[in-house]
Amino acid sequence: MSFLKKSLLLVLFLGLVSHSVCKEEKRETEEENENEEENHEVGSEMKRYAFWYPNRDTEEKNENEEENQEEGSEMKRYAFGYPKREPEEENENEEENHEEGSEMKRYAFEVVGGEAKKMKREPEEENENEEENHEEGSEMKRYAFDVVGGEAKKMKREPEEENENEEENHEEGSEMKRYAFDVVGGEAKKMKREPEEENENEEENHEEGSEMKRYAFDVVGGEAKKM
């Protein structure tokens, strides 16, 4: 009996020891896992700080970024003297500013209500005035050159009269040329002989010249004298 008791006690003791050992191992394992997680977080934290990224959760980070963006835009607006306005108010104010700017431009160019004043005439009036100015300018030119009603004065003769005068001047000039060279009615005077007479005279002169040459060399009838 004593042996059995001792063996049971030993088994129980060994069971307790093994159970405690298992618990210890389990605890150590959990601690190791926790340490690994902590080390991982620490390592990631160190990396984030090394690259100037603070440790923040994703949601908080997004929220903070949005808040910072809004605050930054608000600071810019205050820095430039623009108070914070709601989007609807901003759109309304932009429309009002656009209308005011267009109104100012219209007044600056003396345009009210989209209708041009005397300073700016309508296209139709401008066309009419341009036509009137063109007519007035042509009328002034016509008076400047002594031309009234499209009819030329004595200062400027009509094309037909000019052509007639040109023909008369041409005839007078040809007549003067004919008188200058003693030619009247197309018939040459004694001063200028006709071509036929000139040819006859040339033949006579040629014969006389040949006769003179023959006498100069004492050759008569083509036969040499005793000389």
UniProtKB/Swiss-Prot annotation:
Residues making up the signal peptide according to the UniProt record: 1-20
D-alanine (Ala): residues carrying this PTM: A50, A79, A108, A144, A180, A216
Location of region: Disordered: 22-227
Record's subcellular location: Secreted
InterPro entries: Frog_antimicrobial_propeptide (IPR004275)
Tissues/organs with expression: Expressed by the skin glands.
Coiled-coil intervals: none
GO molecular function, one term: opioid peptide activity
Pfam families: FSAP_sig_propep
Biased composition (Acidic residues): 30-39, 62-72, 88-98, 124-134, 160-170, 196-206
Keyword Lipoprotein part of the UniProt annotation: no
Keywords: Amidation, Amphibian defense peptide, Cleavage on pair of basic residues, D-amino acid, Endorphin, Opioid peptide, Repeat, Secreted, Signal
Removed propeptide positions: 21-46, 57-75, 86-104, 115-140, 151-176, 187-212, 223-227
Function comment: Deltorphin is a heptapeptide with a very potent opiate-like activity. Has high affinity and selectivity for delta-type opioid receptors. The two dermorphin-like peptides have a similar affinity and selectivity for the mu opioid receptor as dermorphin.
Membership in a protein family: Belongs to the frog skin active peptide (FSAP) family. Dermorphin subfamily.
Protein name per the record: [D-Ala2]-deltorphins
